[in-house]
Amino acid sequence: MAKLKVGINGFGRIGRLVLRAGINNPNIEFVGINDLVPPDNLAYLLKYDSTHGKLRSQVEAKDDGIVIDGHFIPCVSVRNPAELPWGKLGADYVVESTGLFTDSEGASKHLQAGAKRVIISAPTKDPDRVRTLLVGVNHDLFDPSKDVIVSNASCTTNCLAPIAKVINDNFGLTEGLMTTVHAMTATQPTVDGPSKKDWRGGRGAAQNIIPSSTGAAKAVALVLPELKGKLTGMAFRVPTPDVSVVDLTFKTAKATSYKEICAAMKQASEGSLAGILGYTDEEVVSTDFQGDTHSSIFDAGAGIELNSNFFKVVAWYDNEWGYSNRVVDLMLSMIQKEQLAAV
């Protein structure tokens, strides 16, 4: 397979971790980074990470880019994606990780700039025009002739969808309520401050457990249409830096037991969802999953059963590292299918 040339727009938490996840992959070459922050600061943030540790590669800053193990990656600082030099840099795919260009119109500016495809590392605001693809769930629906812009949804949807798929495929999921207990993120302030849309979200991240809204559960229907109208959810933002956990309470169509649900999860984790869905029956806590590349890790010891049709299951996820690895996996899956279609 010819190397996939990738550009990154927005070198924040996800942008940097996508690069970390893919930098040693022989099938990927990063050809450009766009961010308003100067290259020397970007290099520093890439090299030293308070959550995931120091990058083991050699990192050096230049006036116009970053050098990683001798490989130079140009850095530019352009506000309008349509003016980016993706064509000149030879970018096949662009990871749109600013959080700003999540609809078709915004993401298509990268195509105007010469990119061939765009992967939005966030939920799309334009689900009717931008297909949502999750590795292990519906990535096989990628159509090279149509899907020039795709969304990888959110880290929480990536965690919930494999769990919901296993439940629905084996027992039928009739309705469910999800809660994600989510690590704090960059959008939250360190101390109390104003927040236009969400007053509670403006409270100090390190001081509070903050109830919040999330579209992650409803978004599962974008990749599993049979679950449309059957799932919704909410979030609690908690003062931990990384690793989150999904709690799904649900009814099944088929009478079953928690033991059978665990068996189905274990089978999927070793078979069709290997590498995507993990499984543990050990006495684990959140930090045990820091650096885990799975989208979702089913915790057999944490779930409960009320009766033969009503259950609660729990699944962990490294909301930064697991998600960033899925972005890389999705790009590789897409380019492989694209190259096969071209033969």
Swiss-Prot record:
Residues bound to NAD(+):
R13, I14, D35, R79, S121, N319
Q: Which GO terms describe its molecular function?
A: glyceraldehyde-3-phosphate dehydrogenase (NAD+) (phosphorylating) activity; NAD binding; NADP binding
Signal peptide location: none
- Asked if the Swiss-Prot or TrEMBL record annotates the protein with the keyword Transferase, the reply is no
EC numbers for this chain: 1.2.1.12
Q: Where is it mostly found? A: cytoplasm
Which Pfam families has this protein been placed in?
Gp_dh_C, Gp_dh_N
Record key words, sorted: Cytoplasm, Glycolysis, NAD, Nucleotide-binding, Oxidoreductase
Task: Name the pathway it acts in.
Answer: Carbohydrate degradation; glycolysis; pyruvate from D-glyceraldehyde 3-phosphate: step 1/5
InterPro entries the record matches: GlycerAld/Erythrose_P_DH, GlycerAld_3-P_DH_AS, GlycerAld_3-P_DH_cat, GlycerAld_3-P_DH_NAD(P)-bd, Glyceraldehyde-3-P_DH_1, NAD(P)-bd_dom_sf
Q: Where in the cell is it found?
A: Cytoplasm
Subunit details: Homotetramer.
Q: Enumerate the NCBIfam families for this protein.
A: GAPDH-I
Give the protein's recorded name: Glyceraldehyde-3-phosphate dehydrogenase 1
Q: Which organism is it from?
A: Trichormus variabilis (strain ATCC 29413 / PCC 7937) (Anabaena variabilis)
* Gene label: gap1
